[in-house]
Design a protein with these regions (language model features):
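Residue-level marker of alpha-helix boundaries and capping positions
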Residues: 65, 103, 124, 180-181
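A short, structure-level motif marking secondary-structure boundaries and short turns
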Residues: 10, 58-60, 97-98, 118, ...
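N-terminal targeting/docking segments
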Residues: 34, 39, 116, 236-238
Length: 242
């Protein structure tokens, strides 16, 4: 069956989340008068990301709400477990202002989307919330390029669960065999998509993250994607997919 649609991850696939997070946190800590509290900017960022990974995993497992994981990240990072929800929300909103000011697409995103626009339908599957990612896509000028936006917070299940990928395919009205998925995480994105029956592309921008899961297609930039999809033997051409 030919591939008719491409589903996309957003953070660190289309949008440079890592860069925006680092820049936003540094500016936020400076404005909050916390610049010296954590030693270097790198040390502060490491603590922030440790808290983010811990509580995002809890959200993905259904242990806390989307807003709850934000509040817990703030409490852990500040080492203030008694911080109220309103206080944690306010701190996080101030951080968001700096983080959003640093939002940017990777330079290969628009050329790839333009090259694929006439041949494939497009959608998004994200482990975030619809409100968060809709706002992000609109800010970045991408929202109208995607027919569907499916997010874990509303869906009640997150990647790499097969059900998340199947729900996104259902939203497109296509079977998994006719859908490709592109994401930067080898397990959450690529393995999850593969296990759900989609054609999985792991976007390894650094090119040095070690071997990926079997049965997925590893690319180091989105400029590779149009040629690889067009070269799939299911279209009767020599396969360019490895």
């Amino acid at each position: 069956m030919p591939i008719r649609a491409v589903l996309w991850d957003i953070d660190d696939t289309l949008f440079d989340y890592t860069g925006a997070d680092a820049a936003g946190l540094a500016r936020h800590l400076r404005d909050e008068g916390l610049g010296e509290r954590y030693g270097t900017a790198a040390e502060a960022l490491a603590l922030w990301r440790k808290a983010t990974e811990l509580h995002w995993a809890r959200f993905a497992a259904g242990e806390v709400t989307f807003l709850g994981q934000r509040q817990e990240r703030v409490r852990e990072f500040l080492e203030e477990p008694a911080l109220t929800a309103d206080e944690a929300d306010a701190w996080f909103e101030r951080y968001l202002g700096h983080y959003q000011a640093a939002w940017a697409l990777f330079p290969d995103v628009l050329p790839a989307l333009d090259a694929l626009a006439g041949s494939y339908r497009h959608g998004v599957l994200s482990n975030s919330s619809e409100a968060n990612q809709d706002h992000k896509l609109r800010h970045l000028g991408l929202r109208e390029r995607f027919e569907v936006l499916v997010c874990a917070a509303e869906l009640g299940v997150s990647k790499p669960d097969t059900a998340a990928f199947l729900a996104a395919c259902d939203a497109l009205g296509l079977p998994p065999a006719e859908v490709a998925y592109v994401g930067d995480q080898p397990e959450i994105d690529a393995r999850g998509a593969r296990d759900a029956g989609l054609t999985a592309f792991w976007l390894d921008r650094d090119g040095g993250r070690g071997p990926g899961p079997g049965g997925v297609h590893r690319i180091e930039g989105l400029e590779q994607l149009p040629g690889l999809l067009a070269g799939d033997t299911r279209f009767g051409a020599r396969s360019g997919i490895r």
